[in-house]
Amino acid sequence: MTKSELVAQLASRFPQLVLKDADFAVKTMLDAMSDALAKGHRIEIRGFGSFGLNRRPARVGRNPKSGEKVQVPEKFVPHFKPGKELRERVDGRAGEPLKADDPDDER
């Protein structure tokens, strides 16, 4: 699902929202989440999951072209951990073949 598909689905579920307002709501939520992660905060959405940061320590890597050693600095990367309800809902679909996203699929 893309951001524009999420906006369209939000607007269709709440008819009082015009597409512009749904787009603003999604952008505002994503901006708030991005800002929180950039400040080092953890985001928890009960029943869905949590977003946090994982630390990748500094290490010595290799330049694939020249083979020379390169110092790779420490960095933090966003990480999502699904909640129990989401894991169980997804696990209920185990064994089903993967398919292209269908916006009409409400499962």
From Swiss-Prot:
Give GO MF terms, alphabetically. DNA binding; structural constituent of chromatin
| Gene Ontology annotations for the cellular component aspect, listed alphabetically | chromosome; cytosol
What's in the keyword line of the UniProt record?
Answer: DNA recombination, DNA-binding, Transcription, Transcription regulation, Translation regulation
Region (Disordered) spans which residues?
76-107
- Bias-annotated ranges (Basic and acidic residues): 82-101
Q: Which Pfam families match?
A: Bac_DNA_binding (PF00216)
Which InterPro entries did the record assign? Answer: Hist_DNA-bd, IHF-like_DNA-bd_dom_sf, IHF_beta
Entry's Gene Ontology BP terms: DNA recombination; regulation of DNA-templated transcription; regulation of translation
Q: Which domain of life is it from?
A: Bacteria
Role description: This protein is one of the two subunits of integration host factor, a specific DNA-binding protein that functions in genetic recombination as well as in transcriptional and translational control.
Q: Which HAMAP family match?
A: IHF_beta
Task: State the similarity comment.
Answer: Belongs to the bacterial histone-like protein family.
Subunit note:
Heterodimer of an alpha and a beta chain.
Protein name, please? Integration host factor subunit beta
> Organism source for this protein?
Burkholderia cenocepacia (strain ATCC BAA-245 / DSM 16553 / LMG 16656 / NCTC 13227 / J2315 / CF5610)
Q: Which gene encodes it?
A: ihfB
